[in-house]
A protein has these predicted regions:
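Active-site-adjacent beta-strand/loop module that shapes the phosphate/pyrophosphate-binding cleft
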Residues: 60, 69-92, 102, 106
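Generic C-terminal helix-cap and adjacent flexible tail
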Residues: 1-2, 126-131
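A conserved beta-turn-beta hairpin within the catalytic core of GNAT-like acetyltransferases
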Residues: 26-30
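The catalytic Nudix box helix
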Residues: 34-66, 105
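NUDIX/MutT-family hydrolases
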Residues: 85, 94-125
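Conserved N-terminal beta-strand and adjoining loop/helix that marks the start
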Residues: 1-17, 38
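Conserved hydrophobic "DFG−1" position in protein kinase catalytic cores
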Residues: 11-12, 19, 86, 103
Length: 131
């Protein structure tokens, strides 16, 4: 089974980070995740992330740096999740793929029902941003 390459944005506004709850009818419905999506052929990871955030959230961000990559095996295949630290001046208010958006403290991320692939990124974030 092929490895699907997916990008996500760890989007900061002030000291809060954006997480989004997947719509019930989507795979992993009800789970929270960092927003993003699949990398399309011919796109760089960064181009994919900027496109996905505009498509899903109508949100323009500034990518600050690559953060962390993780591979997760789901029942129907594996994804490589590539995360980037981003900043925004805007506030996303609605999403095409999510039914709820929440700005949360990094230290509180593991209190949410995160998608399994997002948990290692959340743990690394908490480690990096504590204190």
């Amino acid at each position: 089974m092929d490895l699907i390459k997916v990008v996500c944005g760890i989007i900061f506004k002030d000291d809060l980070v954006l997480i989004c709850r997947r719509k019930a009818e989507k795979s992993l419905g009800g789970y929270w995740e960092f927003p993003g999506g699949k990398v399309e052929d011919g796109e760089s990871n960064e181009e994919s992330l900027l496109r996905e955030l505009i498509e899903e959230l109508n949100l323009k961000v500034k990518i600050k740096q690559h953060f962390f990559d993780t591979v997760h095996q789901y029942d129907n295949g594996a994804i490589e999740l590539i995360s980037f630290i981003c900043e925004t001046e805007n506030i996303a208010s609605e999403s095409t793929d999510h039914d709820q958006l929440q700005w949360v403290k990094v230290s509180d991320l593991l209190d949410w029902k995160l998608a399994p692939a997002d948990i290692p990124i959340a743990k690394k974030l908490i480690e990096e941003f504590k204190g």
